[in-house]
């Protein structure tokens, strides 16, 4: 894998630096590096394709080396270099496409395609010019079963959920109490609602508890807690739990109340947040949100009309908050919202009409992967995203 990365890195640097008018001595290092690459690859035959609609092709490498000059690079020199660049870029893309449609239930982080397996032989070790990227370091650590560290902005750690929990409801659902929740990507939105606005609760305080769990723990977490939950703060017709009828969720946001967010790791309480704003948590794999809705001692007639004593109720008082994970580190590879690598893999597998594999669901959906994230999926995803990043260098 590191050999393919080094080839792509060399091609990428050659493409950027070898331009008409450049002084040769300024690019001599990348020229010599390319020539060493060509000498190593020449005489080798590689095979790509054959899965799905990917065409089969044999690559018999026999490339000319780039010469030296005492002058600036002219158009003829650059054109010769472009021919080498185009050939190697096409070769890299074909290898990456072939690799991205393969998966293995065991040792999924190791190369699976014939070409990548061949490039792992000792003959090509001299090509290993550059393996300093974080992607290569993480892949190398994962393949040795060490603990790599991945850094993510807005990490996609929450499974998609858009539902509710009813704690109380009459036959017509005019008097309802419960939790409305929406989670996706890096966001968890909660609305604790009560049609009576805690009218009959002890001390006029109604308590709500929401439990959440991540499929993988995250660490060094920077998060934001803010009032409001825009995705659940709207009138919505919801089905009842038995799907026999529907009821109107018509929230009115209230400010009276308190909350506590407890963060746990392996069942042990790690940290606690009670205030809005920016917060940090060392590590967690589950969390519990406790909301206490407090009925105000006095209300204007307009507010009382929304929540009349004894009903009927056309609205629900809702205490809302949003938890957003801004930055975090993890020991597991995730779909990165700031990178196109995941979409490159998904699109390649779909465009190639890849047959259903043994590791991922057809279509490579992240939500289904995250909901049942296995070790085999993690290993394969590590390899696939690294290959996608290599392809991206020469696209």
Curated annotation (Swiss-Prot):
It comes from the Viruses. Gene3D superfamilies: 2.60.120.170, Viral capsid alpha domain. One of its GO terms (molecular function) is host cell surface receptor binding. GO terms for biological process: fusion of virus membrane with host plasma membrane. Keywords: Capsid protein, Intermediate capsid protein, Virion. Pfam families: Rota_Capsid_VP6. GO terms for cellular component: viral envelope; viral intermediate capsid. It is found in: Virion. Intermediate capsid protein that self assembles to form an icosahedral capsid with a T=13 symmetry, which consists of 230 trimers of VP6, with channels at each of its five-fold vertices. This capsid constitutes the middle concentric layer of the viral mature particle. The innermost VP2 capsid and the intermediate VP6 capsid remain intact following cell entry to protect the dsRNA from degradation and to prevent unfavorable antiviral responses in the host cell during all the replication cycle of the virus. Homotrimer. Interacts with the inner capsid protein VP2. Interacts with the outer capsid glycoprotein VP7. Belongs to the rotavirus VP6 family. This is Intermediate capsid protein VP6.
């Amino acid at each position: 894998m590191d050999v393919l990365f080094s080839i792509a890195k060399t091609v990428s640097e050659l493409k950027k630096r070898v331009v008409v008018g450049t002084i040769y001595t300024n690019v001599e290092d990348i020229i010599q590096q390319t020539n060493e690459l060509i000498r190593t690859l020449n005489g080798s035959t590689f095979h790509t394709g054959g899965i799905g609609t990917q065409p089969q092709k044999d690559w018999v490498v026999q490339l000319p080396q780039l010469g030296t000059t005492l002058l600036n690079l002219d158009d003829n020199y650059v054109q010769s270099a472009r021919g080498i660049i185009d050939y190697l870029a096409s070769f890299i893309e074909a290898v990456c496409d072939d690799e991205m449609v393969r998966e293995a239930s065991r040792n999924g982080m190791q190369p699976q395609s014939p070409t990548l397996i061949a490039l792992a032989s000792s003959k090509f070790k001299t090509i290993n010019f550059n393996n300093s990227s974080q992607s290569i370091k993480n892949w190398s650590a994962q393949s040795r079963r060490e603990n790599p560290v991945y850094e993510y902005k807005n990490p996609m750690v929450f499974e998609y959920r858009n539902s509710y929990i009813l704690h109380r409801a009459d036959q017509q659902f005019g008097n309802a109490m419960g939790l409305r929740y929406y989670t996706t990507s890096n966001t968890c939105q909660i609305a604790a609602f009560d049609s009576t606005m805690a009218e009959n609760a002890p001390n006029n305080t109604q308590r709500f508890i929401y439990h959440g769990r991540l499929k993988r723990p995250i660490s060094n977490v920077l998060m934001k807690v803010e009032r409001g939950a825009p995705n659940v703060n709207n009138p919505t017709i919801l089905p009842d739990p038995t799907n026999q009828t529907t009821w109107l969720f018509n929230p009115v946001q209230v400010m009276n109340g308190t909350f506590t967010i407890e963060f746990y790791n392996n069942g042990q309480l790690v940290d606690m947040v009670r205030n809005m704003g920016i917060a940090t948590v060392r590590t967690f794999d589950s969390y519990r949100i406790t909301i206490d809705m407090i009925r105000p001692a006095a209300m204007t007639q307009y507010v009382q009309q929304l929540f009349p004593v004894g009903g009927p109720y056309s609205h629900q008082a809702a205490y809302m908050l949003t938890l957003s994970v801004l930055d975090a580190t993890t020991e597991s590879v995730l779909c990165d919202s700031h990178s196109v690598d995941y979409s490159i893999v998904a699109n390649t597998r779909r465009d190639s009409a890849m047959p259903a594999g043994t590791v991922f669901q057809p279509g490579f959906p992240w939500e289904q992967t995250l909901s049942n994230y296995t070790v085999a999926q993690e290993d394969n995803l590590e390899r696939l995203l690294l290959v996608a990043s290599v392809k991206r260098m020469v696209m």
